[in-house]
UniProtKB/Swiss-Prot annotation:
It comes from the Bacteria. It comes from Parabacteroides distasonis (strain ATCC 8503 / DSM 20701 / CIP 104284 / JCM 5825 / NCTC 11152). Residues 38-106 form the KH type-2 domain. The gene is rpsC. This is Small ribosomal subunit protein uS3. Residues 222-244 are annotated as: Disordered.
Amino acid sequence: MGQKVNPISNRLGIIRGWDSNWYGGKNYGDTLLEDSKIRKYLNARLAKASVSRIVIERTLKLITITVCTSRPGIIIGKGGQEVDKLKEELKKITDKEVQINIFEVKRPELDAVIVANNIARQLEGKIAYRRAVKMAIASTMRMGAEGIKIQISGRLNGAEMARSEMYKEGRTPLHTLRADIDYALAEALTKVGLLGVKVWICRGEVYGKRDLAPSFTAAKETGRRNDNAGGNRDKNFKRKRANR
């Protein structure tokens, strides 16, 4: 089961919180569709900002959007001009007041979304896939990850028949629900077709009770950074030593 299911959805309510926090009632379908439009727009609009996660919280008249990124300066802009422009664009989509919080991911090498997107962009830039994967694995393990697994699928090296190749280092225990496994899927559009990149990163294990509410909701007002480290783990977070 753990090998097939999405590791993030498998840990919701255990060690991982939800990315959409609101009560929809009878308008649940419309609200969910609006969330999907917001995420799709932000991912396209902020493609160069290395966006890791988008958390949406709603009240009756206000939508609070927290954007986790490793390059907050691109989103904020000079004097906060870019983030103000982004707020106005989102108001047209939602017809509601929008507040945007920017959370800086301090260790992007431990974020599966950022790692997967970086590999995909390198593949589009005609860099050899083995080199891109080995560089990603080395930088992730250097930052203290317990393990990483990367799978690339498609017409690798322009081969006529598509295939999948998997590279891994360390441990990624997908069946252990207390294991903090981050997962992401990215796509690279190349001349020979579409290549899929899947990344699993094990960042240790979580012991004891964990607050599932978004830990970055205390981010500063619009256009300011949160000084917490990316990942923002609580005090109960412990890493298993390598000799265990």
